[in-house]
A protein has these predicted regions:
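Bacterial Sec-dependent N-terminal signal peptides
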Residues: 1-22
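Cysteine-centric segments in proteins
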Residues: 21-143
């Protein structure tokens, strides 16, 4: 009887540990190397790595209107715009949500490339449950 009880307790503990690991999965953004079809026209393309930027590999892609994409742990996630704010100093804050994630992109125009395009820098914050990841990003936005 004691053996059965010990096995039962060990099994319960193991199941709790496995479930806990699933809920505490680390947020790991992956590079998106192909722009999704519904992102066309004006875009915001951001990464945290200059080499990746040259290779056209981004961690967030937006249509500068209603849709953005991120790739987390190998899964492409479509996000919908919740809120867009103009902040002082050519700074913009866009909040997106989808598939349990909240994503906050804050970008500031660093250099105007031409009439319709600018070089931007800022931060990207990805939140899911109690997990948060905040990274510096840079990229290009415009039409």
């Amino acid at each position: 009887m004691k053996t059965v009880l010990m096995l039962l307790l060990c099994s319960c503990y193991f199941i709790k540990q496995v479930n806990g690991q699933e809920n505490n999965e680390v947020i790991k953004p992956d590079f998106i190397t192909q722009i999704p079809r519904d992102i066309e026209g004006c875009t915001g393309l951001y990464t945290f790595d200059s080499t990746a930027f040259k290779k056209k590999a981004y961690i967030i892609e937006t249509d500068l209107r209603q849709t953005a994409y991120i790739k987390i742990n190998g899964k492409l996630i479509k996000l919908k715009l919740l809120n867009n704010k103009n902040l002082p100093g050519e700074t913009y804050k866009s909040t997106y949500s989808g598939d349990g994630y909240t994503v906050i992109l804050i970008s500031k125009t660093v250099k105007q490339i031409d009439v319709e395009k600018s070089l931007d820098s800022g931060t990207l914050e990805i939140i899911k449950d109690k997990q948060k990841l905040k990274v510096k990003v840079h990229g290009i936005s415009g039409c």
